[in-house]
């Protein structure tokens, strides 16, 4: 049970260093803007931007997507961008610099005790990572922040602004104290993940392990409360960041993510029977997959439909067992770690896309499906209503009967599916653009730069 719990938490965490740089562009470039805008300077003046991301998986979760597309949009606006990232590293364009700060990544290993190396005795940070992971903790955000501070001390990079992507580490305090303007993005407070995991725990032992894993939240609360410039990707995430982290409401600006509408576009592909599609970025309670499985089993009583799952359920996990109990395994088609182009092809075969999450800070899967012209059934959890709007069907979280009714109704009404598909595509193209997101983000950069020397 212990190992399974650790694996689920790691997959769901929206959670002596060697340094190597690949294609670094910003750190070595001459500064083209000072720490505060001089009179008459343009807000469009190019900036040297440092994006921090402690984990940037390009295939799972939203943080790697955020880093990839925001860095691209910033460079297209004329700014220079370096991404400093721990493993897994992001997929970046060639004109975006990547500075690798690998940690020990002990939490990725099942045999944590066996990962001990004698070199840890000479490296206090590596020893901390190993001990924390060995005792059920998640050391990555804190350790990444320490390595970032060390990197800045060793290399003295010339950045105009540092933008943290949800590490919310103590290292941000240090960077601000040393004169670096800092902005941080909170996709959603991870307290939401902790609460969902605790609610689904089987016994007090598992709850104890969960609380140990999420100890890093104490650090993130402390850091967010002290930051004067915070971005959230939805109004819902803003409210929860204030409520759960105690953030100053006046310090937060909402900047919605964009969607790559050149990549995610309608493609009509042949299908043999009705197809329902969903993505599973992590097999954790927060994603609500069990409610979709129950709903799909209900729908199968009336419609010979197929469920397409992009992602995978943990072997022997709750969802894996539920598939067997419901007898729907022969109607489920799974795909894991596929290319974006392949994902768009799969959307082209789908009649309905479903996002059953209990909570999403934004809801990239909903936006991507809408961009592909696929009608969406989603819950009202978190930022999903802000993405879906009137272009889909919204139901309450944790309600498989409501999900089943909405799916069944759309599968039986082709005209409504077409209307919603067209409306969804139009909504995403018009309202969720990465260039717009980058421009709004740059406004916050300039505010941070202007106020850094004023004790903000």
Task: List the predicted regions and their residue ranges.
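Acceptor-binding helix/loop patch of EC 2.4 sugar-transfer enzymes
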Residues: 113-136, 176-221
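Carbohydrate-associated surface elements
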Residues: 236, 258
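Conserved donor-binding/catalytic core segment of Leloir-type glycosyltransferases
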Residues: 268-296
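Nucleotide-activated donor-binding/catalytic signature segment of Leloir-type glycosyltransferases, i.e.
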Residues: 320-341
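Short alpha-helical donor nucleotide-sugar binding micro-motif in glycosyltransferases
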Residues: 337-338, 345-350
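Aromatic "clamp/platform" in nucleotide-sugar-dependent glycosyltransferases that forms part
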Residues: 358
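Short hydrophobic beta-strand element within catalytic cores of glycosyltransferases
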Residues: 375-378
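Conserved acidic donor-binding segment of nucleotide-sugar-dependent glycosyltransferases
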Residues: 393-400, 409-414
């Amino acid at each position: 049970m212990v190992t399974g719990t650790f694996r689920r938490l790691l997959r769901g965490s929206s959670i002596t260093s060697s340094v190597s740089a690949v294609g670094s562009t910003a750190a070595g470039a001459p500064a083209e803007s000072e720490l505060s805008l001089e009179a008459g300077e343009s807000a469009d003046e190019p900036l040297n931007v440092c994006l921090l991301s402690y984990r940037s998986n390009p295939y799972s979760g939203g943080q790697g997507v955020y880093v990839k597309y925001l860095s691209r949009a910033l460079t297209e606006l004329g700014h220079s961008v370096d991404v400093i990232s721990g493993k897994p590293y992001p997929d970046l364009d060639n004109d975006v610099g990547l500075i690798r700060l690998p940690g020990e990544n002990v939490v990725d290993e099942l045999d944590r005790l066996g990962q001990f190396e004698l070199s840890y005795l000479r490296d206090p940070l590596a020893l901390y990572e190993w001990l924390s992971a060995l005792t059920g903790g998640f050391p990555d955000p804190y350790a990444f922040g320490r390595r970032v501070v060390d990197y800045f001390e060793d290399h003295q990079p010339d950045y105009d602004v540092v933008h943290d992507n949800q590490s919310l580490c103590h290292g941000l305090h240090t960077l601000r104290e040393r004169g670096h303007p800092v902005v941080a993005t909170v996709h959603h407070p991870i307290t939401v993940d902790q609460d969902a995991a605790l609610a689904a725990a089987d016994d007090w032992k598992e709850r104890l392990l969960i609380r140990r894993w999420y100890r890093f939240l104490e650090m993130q609360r402390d850091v967010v409360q002290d930051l004067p410039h915070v971005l959230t990707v939805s109004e819902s995430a803003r409210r929860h960041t204030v409520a759960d982290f105690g953030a100053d409401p006046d310090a937060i600006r909402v900047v919605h993510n964009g969607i790559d509408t050149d990549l995610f576009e309608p493609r009509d592909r042949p299908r043999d029977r009705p197809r329902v599609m969903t993505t599973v970025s992590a097999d954790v309670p927060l994603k609500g997959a069990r409610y979709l499985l129950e709903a799909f089993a209900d729908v199968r009583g009336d419609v010979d439909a197929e469920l397409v799952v992009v992602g995978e359920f943990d072997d022997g996990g709750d969802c894996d067992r539920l598939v067997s109990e419901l007898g729907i395994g022969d109607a489920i088609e799974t795909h894991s770690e596929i290319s974006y182009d392949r994902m768009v092809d799969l959307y082209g075969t789908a009649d309905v896309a479903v996002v059953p999450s209990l909570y999403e800070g934004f809801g990239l899967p909903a936006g991507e499906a809408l961009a592909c012209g696929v009608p969406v059934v989603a819950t009202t959890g978190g930022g999903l209503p802000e993405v879906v709007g009137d272009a889909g069907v919204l139901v309450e979280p944790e309600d498989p009967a409501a999900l089943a009714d909405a799916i069944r109704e759309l599968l039986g009404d082709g005209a409504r599916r077409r209307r919603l598909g067209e409306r969804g595509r139009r909504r995403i193209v018009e309202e969720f653009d990465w260039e717009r997101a980058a421009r709004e983000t740059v406004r916050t950069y300039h505010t941070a730069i202007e106020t850094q020397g004023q004790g903000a």
